[in-house]
């Protein structure tokens, strides 16, 4: 199968990434990727931008180098299951990932992580949970993924985690998480987690996982731009006028 949407990418605005959004779009165009979400880190992450950065994404063109640009954010899970963007930001974004990051949420125990994930799902402020395979943030797979399925929050399959070079120990956990998502009928999304433009849309490890466990493509929201936009509608997001031509 071929993934056509990358829902987790970074620009240099994240503080530890190295490309502009124009460079990311050019790389996506060269690859033939029709759509990606730009999801820089929210402000609690060291080096990340002020929340005004996300409010002002309205100035971004909807297409750059003929690639559809979805305005997003990778928010940090903090406290007992909050996210670190003000409520006023929500209306400016098309897509929000919530993720654990050690500098913001020190690793605790499975129960604490599970409770935080369930709370953030139930807040209805996030569309996906990012890189859940990280062994530093163990959680009850069944409880969290069942809750995500109930609330139509996507579970991210993260290509960077599956490479095994960061968040060491994630690979087997990613496979197990995907199997539980398949069993419980949860939606999954796919993110390169690119911090450099040449990694945009690179999904060899994720595509292998999907093929290996025969994950149903109707639950892979990034299989086509239309499936992704249909998922946004399911989540209650307003239609994006400029993307109507992609709904075929």
Curated annotation (Swiss-Prot):
The keyword Cytoplasm does not apply. Zn(2+) 1 binds at residues 8, 10, 74, 193. CDD domains: PHP_HisPPase_Ycdx_like (cd07437). Binds 3 Zn(2+) ions per subunit. Its cofactor is Zn(2+). SMART domains: POLIIIAc. It is an enzyme of class 3 (hydrolase). Its EC number is 3.1.3.-. Zn(2+) 3 binds at residues 74, 101, 131. Coiled coil: none annotated. SUPFAM superfamilies: PHP domain-like. GO terms for cellular component: cytosol. Keywords: Hydrolase, Metal-binding, Zinc. GO terms for molecular function: phosphatase activity; zinc ion binding. Zn(2+) 2 binds at residues 16, 41, 195. GO terms for biological process: bacterial-type flagellum-dependent swarming motility. InterPro entries: Phosphatase_YcdX_put, PHP_dom, PHP_phosphatase, Pol/His_phosphatase_N, Pol/histidinol_Pase-like. Belongs to the PHP family. This is Probable phosphatase VFMJ11_A0899.
């Amino acid at each position: 199968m071929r993934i056509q949407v990358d829902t987790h990418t970074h620009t240099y605005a994240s503080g530890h990434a190295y490309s502009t959004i124009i460079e990311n779009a050019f790389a996506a165009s060269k690859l033939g990727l029709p759509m990606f979400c730009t999801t820089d880190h929210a402000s609690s992450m060291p080096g990340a931008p002020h929340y005004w950065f996300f409010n002002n994404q309205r100035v971004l063109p909807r297409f750059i180098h003929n690639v559809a640009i979805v305005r997003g954010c990778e928010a940090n899970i903090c406290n007992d299951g909050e996210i670190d963007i003000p409520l006023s930001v929500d209306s400016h974004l098309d897509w929000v990932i919530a993720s654990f990051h050690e500098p913001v949420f020190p690793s605790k125990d499975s129960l604490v992580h599970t409770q935080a994930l369930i709370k953030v799902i139930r807040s209805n402020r996030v569309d996906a949970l990012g890189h859940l395979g990280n062994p530093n943030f163990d959680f009850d797979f069944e409880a969290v993924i069942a809750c995500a399925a109930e609330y139509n929050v996507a579970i991210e399959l993260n290509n960077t985690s599956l490479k095994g070079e960061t968040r060491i120990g994630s690979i087997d956990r990613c496979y197990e998480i995907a199997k539980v998502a398949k069993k419980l009928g949860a939606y999954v999304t796919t993110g390169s987690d690119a911090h450099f433009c040449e990694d945009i849309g690179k999904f060899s490890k994720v595509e292998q996982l999907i093929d290996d466990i025969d994950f149903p493509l109707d639950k892979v929201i990034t299989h086509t731009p239309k499936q992704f936009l249909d998922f946004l509608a399911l989540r209650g997001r307003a239609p994006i006028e400029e993307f109507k031509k992609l709904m075929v």
